[in-house]
């Protein structure tokens, strides 16, 4: 009698967010077999324990899920005697991948908050861009972080804190945005935008003008 070894749950990101993905269960089959002879045993997948026990309604491979969370029942049987079988189950989970919408270039005037309004450095409240990144997506489902490189955004490292003071890149710098599914952080996308800081001009004192009107008009 074959042994239905433990199969890890599947967690997949849905890039087009239609809730449907294709599964071939190749890795799941390797886990079920766990070294048992694949020529001596057959593995099938079902949507209920009863179907797995009776070997009915086996799922076609590739399988396209109908719900974002499903329990899959696995049957492994001896090809020489199909009454010798074992079953196990695992969960299939599909998560939405958020869209990182375009953020327009942000332009701001330098100020005296740091004592110098001509050094191209000022605080920017990055969280003010969250709505632009979301563009209608549910903020409760996704987390947004800001980074100074694409690599940091992809690896979700070195997130910069809002408000951010650009003490290393005066006048202009790029910000890389990561938006991820709060339930499955591997489901994410990124975008980037530029922040330009302009020197605030000084309005110097102008002397009053006094003129004579020769024709008195």
What are these regions (language model features)?
Residues 1-217:
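Extracellular low-complexity Ser/Thr/Asn/Gly-rich intrinsically disordered segments
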């Amino acid at each position: 009698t074959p042994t239905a070894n433990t199969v890890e749950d599947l967690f997949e990101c849905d890039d087009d967010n239609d809730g449907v993905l294709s599964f071939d269960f190749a890795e799941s089959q390797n886990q079920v077999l766990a070294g048992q002879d694949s020529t001596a045993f057959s593995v099938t997948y079902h949507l209920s324990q009863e179907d797995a026990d009776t070997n009915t309604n086996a799922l076609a491979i590739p399988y396209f899920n109908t719900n974002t969370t499903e329990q899959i029942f696995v049957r492994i049987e001896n090809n020489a005697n199909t009454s010798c079988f074992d079953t196990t189950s695992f969960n299939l989970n599909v998560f939405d991948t958020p869209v990182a919408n375009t953020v327009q270039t942000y332009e701001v005037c330098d100020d005296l908050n740091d004592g110098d309004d001509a050094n191209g450095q000022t605080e920017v409240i990055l969280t003010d861009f969250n709505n632009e990144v979301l563009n209608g997506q549910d903020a409760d489902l996704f987390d947004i972080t800001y980074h100074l490189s694409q690599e940091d955004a992809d690896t979700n490292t070195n997130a910069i804190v809002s408000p951010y003071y650009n003490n290393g890149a005066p006048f202009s710098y790029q910000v890389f945005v990561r938006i991820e599914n709060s339930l499955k952080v591997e489901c994410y996308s990124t975008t980037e935008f530029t922040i330009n800081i302009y020197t605030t001009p000084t309005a110097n004192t102008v002397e009053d003008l006094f003129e004579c009107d020769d024709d008195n008009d």
